């Protein structure tokens, strides 16, 4: 298992609010919690930045972290990430902030300590462009959206 440096920025983390953990042995994502003083109510269409009380430093340029919505919040309540996916570069050292968007029809209240997003670690490959005049031909060619059909 890879070790990632984490800094607790809010003393409630690890006491009132549990540290991020994997829910099961097969979980890909660590749950991130809202490190709030008071509940925050989001009206339909509203967004807000929610602190986690944590900063990470991945340090390894072959890794990045991604913040993703929790499936139940998105499906049942319309609560997703305002930027859809949050990308954390290996050299970032600031607080993890979660952009929360209420795309649902009802007000939604985020409670202090509530699990509102998940974070996964993914491999990174930095590419170098090779300028060419043409590509080698493939069966697909320039076929784009819907090119391969629905069934």
UniProtKB/Swiss-Prot annotation:
Binding site for substrate: 70-72, 83, 87-89, 97
GO MF annotations in UniProt: dUTP diphosphatase activity; magnesium ion binding
Cofactors that this protein relies on: Mg(2+)
Catalyzed chemical reaction(s): dUTP + H2O = dUMP + diphosphate + H(+)
Keyword Metal-binding: yes
Source domain of life: Bacteria
EC number: 3.6.1.23
Keywords: Hydrolase, Magnesium, Metal-binding, Nucleotide metabolism
Metabolic or biological pathway, per its Swiss-Prot or TrEMBL entry: Pyrimidine metabolism; dUMP biosynthesis; dUMP from dCTP (dUTP route): step 2/2
Catalytic EC class: hydrolase
GO BP annotations listed: dUMP biosynthetic process; dUTP catabolic process
The keyword Magnesium appears for this protein: yes
Pfam families tied to this protein: dUTPase
Disulfide bonding pattern of the chain: none
Membrane-traversing stretches: none
Recorded family membership: Belongs to the dUTPase family.
Subunit text: Homotrimer.
Described purpose of this protein according to its UniProt entry: This enzyme is involved in nucleotide metabolism: it produces dUMP, the immediate precursor of thymidine nucleotides and it decreases the intracellular concentration of dUTP so that uracil cannot be incorporated into DNA.
Protein name: Deoxyuridine 5'-triphosphate nucleotidohydrolase
Gene: dut
